[in-house]
From Swiss-Prot:
The keyword Ribosomal protein applies. The keyword Cell wall biogenesis/degradation does not apply. One of its GO terms (biological process) is translation. It holds the Pfam family Ribosomal_L17. The gene is rplQ. This is Large ribosomal subunit protein bL17. Disulfide bonds: none annotated. Keywords: Ribonucleoprotein, Ribosomal protein. Residues 134-144 have a biased composition (Low complexity).
Amino acid sequence: MPKPTKGPRLGGSSSHQKALLTNLAASLFEHGRIKTTEPKARALRPYAEKLITHAKKGTLHNRREVLKKLPDKDVVHALFAEIGPFFSDRDGGYTRIIKVEARKGDNAPMAVIELVREKTVTSEADRARRVAAASAKAAQAQEKPAQEEEVEATSDEVAYTSEPDKAAEH
């Protein structure tokens, strides 16, 4: 059974908060970024990210689940056709909240919430760097036993050469 959210609602009632989040999410998916108050942006972030996760899966069931929350079919089509496939290789973190200066009239804290459009180049570069370091360590580990065998062979040769010297001395 669904439980009501704790704490104050945005805009008053639960139904108004649901309508507010629906409209904010539709605007976010339509425009890519929106400017709103900071509490609304913080409330919108998990709501929008769950919808994007549904869009990434792309099944008919997921489309119907999103249509329950976003009644605008054009926005849902854009979400499933463009936004979902764009984030297919990203595991969460589809949105970014940037704080901006307070609103002039009532000094309300404002923020810009936007879809992250950059590919995760840094994580791919870090992953490639880690793989290269691991392969270099493996190559060094294979070279060390070969070098130790050579060292042992030279010490054996020294031992053999020193033994005949001892035999000559006796």
